[in-house]
């Protein structure tokens, strides 16, 4: 009888949304790139198993009907969600508080629980959950079986998450950790003109140097500008940056060439792609000229697949790193070669030239000193991320 009841609930849920979905489509309003979480970024005590975690994200564009994706794609064991809720968060991550009366339970095929096998991604049933632009959202999971040493997640959340023992709802004394686990995307049911930008990037896109709980990565600043512009106010921004990521080999997380089919083409409603990778490849061991050529080949493949899907692709030249340990004459020559190709090859539908916008006027091979994060000569600070968000021509996303 329980199985029949769950099936009936699922059918009724689908019927309830069939009218609302007429003439609409799903668009991701928030998403994150995932990997096997490194040991030092794994959940702290009390851990995930048989405990509860509340995670805060800030979405892009508004919606009234949503669904949430949860991922166990990189873990070795199953994850059981006993129950999950979505609610409006009171802050952008500085506290675990939620706005009273906004909690909505999530279901999976009509059931409040779901077990996600290794390698799987699950999507909740659609629910009515009104949220505005740049909405702070809390996703709470009450977990059963779940490893804290082999876990799928996003280490560089730049946002606090909150972990408590047991299956309760009082997070006032929760353990904080600045990582996301298991949550993958939030999608809205939207009118046809709503669409998404997805960015493939590394730690600069992931927001290294931005401020925890302030949501001030360059992609956040771009999103705010898009929302304020009449012709782009229904364009979301999906950040697929991974710290330490390489396109070709090595680095942290799946390589760009292995993850792009999932991180770019499995996102809902994508109309535009921004490719902004390469610095970790060029700055590593080996000949940077050869690497630049190999990166071009990967970019050509991504562009071809995107164009087959009707998606525009914008290239972003690699920013300066003179003064960082990555720098050498060979590495700089590789950067210049790749950047020249991005600007002039004609493969891209447009160029977003962070390199031109962020350079030191007295030494174009170096980041502008006023934009340096901790003088590492690689990552921008919060002001630098504002400059990056501001230098982008919004006309690229108007059609």
Regions found by a protein language model. Give the residues of each.
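Bacterial N-terminal signal peptides
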Residues: 9-16
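Catalytic His-Asp segment of secreted/periplasmic serine-dependent ester chemistry enzymes
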Residues: 283, 319-399
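Conserved SGNH/GDSL esterase-like catalytic core that processes O-acyl groups on lipids
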Residues: 30, 49-55, 78, 82-94, ...
């Amino acid at each position: 009888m329980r199985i029949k009841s769950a099936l009936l609930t699922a059918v009724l849920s689908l019927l309830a949304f069939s009218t609302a979905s007429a003439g609409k489509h799903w668009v991701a309003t928030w998403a994150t790139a995932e990997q096997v979480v490194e040991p030092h970024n794994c959940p702290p005590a009390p851990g995930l198993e048989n405990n509860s975690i509340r995670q805060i994200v800030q979405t892009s564009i508004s919606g009234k009907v949503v669904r949430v994706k949860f991922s166990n794609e990189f873990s070795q064991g199953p994850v059981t969600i006993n129950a999950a809720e979505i609610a409006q968060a009171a802050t952008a991550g500085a506290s675990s508080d939620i706005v009273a009366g906004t909690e909505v339970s999530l279901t999976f095929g009509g059931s409040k629980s779901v077990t996600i096998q290794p390698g799987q991604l699950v999507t909740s049933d659609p629910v009515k959950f009104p949220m505005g632009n740049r909405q702070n959202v809390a996703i709470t999971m009450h977990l059963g079986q779940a490893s804290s040493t082999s876990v799928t997640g996003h280490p560089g959340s730049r946002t606090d998450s909150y972990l408590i023992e047991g299956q309760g709802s009082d997070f006032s004394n929760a353990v904080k950790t600045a990582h996301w686990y298991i949550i993958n995307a939030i999608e809205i049911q939207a009118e046809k003109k709503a669409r998404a930008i997805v960015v493939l990037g590394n730690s600069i896109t992931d927001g290294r140097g931005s401020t925890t709980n302030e949501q001030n990565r360059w992609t956040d600043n771009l999103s705010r500008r898009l929302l304020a512009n009449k012709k782009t106010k229904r364009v979301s921004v999906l950040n697929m940056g991974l710290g330490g990521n390489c396109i070709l080999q090595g680095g942290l997380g799946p390589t760009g060439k292995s993850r792009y089919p999932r991180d770019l083409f499995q996102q809902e409603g994508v109309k535009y792609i921004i490719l902004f990778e390469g610095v970790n490849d060029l700055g590593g061991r080996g000949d940077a000229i050869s690497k630049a050529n190999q990166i071009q080949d990967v970019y050509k493949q991504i562009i071809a697949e995107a164009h087959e899907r009707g998606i525009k692709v914008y290239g972003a030249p690699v920013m300066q790193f003179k003064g960082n340990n990555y720098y050498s004459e060979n590495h700089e020559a590789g950067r210049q070669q790749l950047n020249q190709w991005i600007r002039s090859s004609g493969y891209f539908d447009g160029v977003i030239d962070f390199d031109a916008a962020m350079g030191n006027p007295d030494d174009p091979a170096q980041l502008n000193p006023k934009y340096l994060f901790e003088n590492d000569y690689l990552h921008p600070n919060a002001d630098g991320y504002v400059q990056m968000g501001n230098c982008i021509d919004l006309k690229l996303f108007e059609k």
